[in-house]
Amino acid sequence: MTNFKFSLLACSIAFALNASTAYAAQPTNQPTNQPTNQPTNQPTNQPTNQPTNQPTNQDSNLSEQLEQINVSGSTENSDSKTPPKIAETVKTAKTLEREQANNIKDIVKYETGVTVVEAGRFGQSGFAIRGVDENRVAINIDGLRQAETLSSQGFKELFEGYGNFNNTRNGAEIETLKEVNITKGANSIKSGSGSLGGSVIYKTKDARDYLLNKDYYVSYKKGYATENNQSFNTLTLAGRYKKFDVLVVTTSRNGHELENYGYKNYNDKIQGKRREKADPYKIEQDSTLLKLSFNPTENHRFTLAADLYEHRSRGQDLSYTLKYLKTLPDLPEVDSRHTNDKTKRHNISFSYENFSQTPFWDTLKITFSKQKIKTRARTDEYCDAGVRYCEGTANPAGLKLKNGEITRRDGTPLQFKEINNTTTPNSNSNKDKTYDFSKLIDTNGKEIESGITRSNDTFWYDCSIFDCENPGKMKVAEGKTYYRYDGTWKNNVQLEKKVLNGKEFARINNGTRGKTFPILPSSLGYLERLWQERDLDTNTQQLNLDLTKDFKTWRVEHNLQYGSSYNTTMKRMVNRAGYDATDVQWWAKRTLGTRFDFLKNEEIVETCATTFGWNAFLCPRVDPEFSYLLPIKTKEKSVYLFDNVVITDYLSFDLGYRYDNIHYQPKYKHGVTPKLPDDIVKELFIPLKSGQNNNDAEVKKNVQENIDYIAKQNKKYKAHSYSFVSTIDPTSFLRLQLKYSKGFRAPTSDEMYFTFKHPDFTILPNTHLKPEIAKTKEIAFTLHHDDWGFISTSLFKTNYRDFIDLVYKGEREFEVGNPNNRGKISFDTFQNINRDSAVVKGIEINSKVFLGKMAKFMDGFNLSYKYTYQKGRMDGNIPMNAIQPKTMVYGLGYDHPSQKFGFNFYTTHVASKNPEDTYDIYAKDKNQTNTSIKWRSKSYTILDLIGYVQPIKNLTIRAGVYNLTNRKYITWDSARSIRSFGTSNVIDQKTGQGINRFYAPGRNYKMSVQFEF
């Protein structure tokens, strides 16, 4: 009978490895009698929650176990033989190191059914799981919810389409993570609001992970990746002295943009939507994790922690197009968009842990956290003088200032074309020679356009740049007639010196207006720069109380976890904009000069407030701060209860319940809070009186009334979440798991209140939105054996109710300006609504077999297979774009028994995205009968080979070759990030030019070296 079990398992795995219609679930490294829905921010009875000076009952492999990172539903760790838990994946730190994960995208590289949302220049923005993405997939770090995007689809389409906001979910530094837990399907027990499609929960490392058998640990790792030329350095220090222990993990990363396929073959000078080469960015990331703990006794532990993370990206959006502002869209670009984006997260926390067993708890943990997250998008638009001709700094003659004197480009005296002179050309014997000052004799003897100024304005020489003590160095011409270039050199130049605004200047004092002109380039001498800086701030203070208790009732074992949480979050937007100058040249005006005041009968110094002209260099402008959204304060209270009930060795249940109370409070103080543009709130709720549309006083009053009205609209939501999981083991090799869970997401303030008016794209507010609800049903069958491995097949279905989505509402007329002048204009309108229903269903397979049982020479080898197929529809038959195409991952791995070396070979196959499974929300607006998305991903297969070697005890070398066959492909997440309108992430929709920018890298390599002591 035993042999039959082994044969049945082996045959089942072999079938899964070859089946194209297989169904995958995710494995886990958790013991089977542990709760599957355990809140990740809660303490458990694991050794990592024990004081470092306490003995443990773990075996000799505990050190290795504690350095593992768990991702619910996965068993990438090559030595893991534990069968998977339903709908969860567990990935270890050892696995992330083995796979050389550098970012969140690498974490799920070999997972099926989980992908990362692409956000163009801003990188990644959260995850996509089971048909939903971004804010509908919860992300926590050490129990703290991470920054959410402004989830109103109208806001995203409107502003992200133009690259104005860094509206993304922040990432995490891989090197600081101890555990990553990915749950598929609705489950708000762990994360509260937002866990509709699933959750991704990170836990950071702790000194106790390294100090089990010694009092210190030192590690240094250096790595490099060719896909983006990223190099990184990580230093890890852990130590214990008496009752104190400390951990420091610091990481720095430096690289550039991800190199798309054919990166080196494309023209890097092309600007606009037809650009095929990835936009250039310099990307840096710094992270520091610091934890200091004090254990006064063996049952008490205090910890002060700081988790500091900063991601910076500087470069140019060369694919960005400004042509929407041009009359002739085919004109070449002049200005280019320079970016300086930042994501910054600071979390300071203090925790107290108690391990004294009482009637109410076995472990108790109280944590206070203060987290600040800032996502910033900074853009500067100006002409790139180093790349193209720029009118503002044009100097065609190459005039140069040398030792206070104006010369030719090589420092030699100026020479101009002579006109009808009888003397020797350029001879000094006749100072009255006539020249054409528009023609300069270049250093090679050829005539070129001088491009000198013929301005009527008085030029003030800055004496700190020009030699005001030697007027002869001021090259000045005297025209024969007014406003022409033919003339003579002006002799005996006299200068009038004046101190203007604390600096000494000089001007020509003996010239003739209209005839006398300085030899200077005619351009402004600087580049005008329009800049915008837009911040999204999320500041959270949170208090957690988490307890665990193990007990028995009769013969039934209970592993009880319960607790509560209270937090306040302030989310606000701050926009800054201005106008100034960059690349200032030596001939640029350094003063506005003077003008004669006839009332005062005297000459006065010009200022930015009094001048009639405009000078971006001397009079830069900074606009008042403004915002498109009211700041919102959110108060959240929650209590939870979770019990893992073990009835017998063959039957156990996981029961979870959570109650959430969410209160939104708009906060606005007139004159203090960044102002909302009038057009956004005018007549939003309170209409203007008839005929007052052009009355400025009435409009201002109406704006304030509408803001006050919004600020008083507090919103409250209550939610009850639950989860039920049953695990049945009828035999030693067969397991049946059933899951039913509920999750929710409360509408965000921007989804309810955001409005925007434009004839092409108008967003209407909707204050009647209901919370989104998700209910997941899942069943999993698992064949497993301690020596052979496992195969797990699951079927799932998630029903979404009141799914919030942006829909086209048709045309609507708005009164604009004076009705007698412009009348009414039709606006294309969109609005967030609660859809009646949405459903996602699918099948997953997850299997792993260890080959050592088949033959001795195959000891250490393993085969794995994962497969996910899912399909989803909204409102009956509208496809859900976040659903991934059918995906399967084959794996072959090997680990030497002594762990001296090993490798993994992965084959990933992704099917094409079918047109009937996509939906263009702008199809109606474009009067299209075909509602599918035009640009989709085709099927592809990629091969990766990664390995490690440990030549000596303290040294580990890892290397990998990715996309081994150099396959050209585009992922569905990249393809769906292409926008049909806007100026960012756009291509030529007619020809497809520019789409190569979105393709994944070709063959690339990674390598790292790590020393440990």
Curated annotation (Swiss-Prot):
One of its GO terms (cellular component) is cell outer membrane. A motif (TonB C-terminal box) lies at residues 996-1013. Its main location: membrane. Residues 78-205 form the TBDR plug domain. Residues 26-61 are annotated as: Disordered. Sequence repeats lie at residues 26-29, 30-33, 34-37, 38-41, 42-45, 46-49, 50-53, 54-57. Keywords: Cell outer membrane, Membrane, Receptor, Repeat, Signal, TonB box, Transmembrane, Transmembrane beta strand, Transport. It holds the Pfam family Plug. Residues 1-24 form the signal peptide. A motif (TonB box) lies at residues 67-74. One of its GO terms (molecular function) is siderophore uptake transmembrane transporter activity. It is a multi-pass membrane protein. It is found in: Cell outer membrane. This is Hemoglobin-binding protein A. The gene is hgbA.
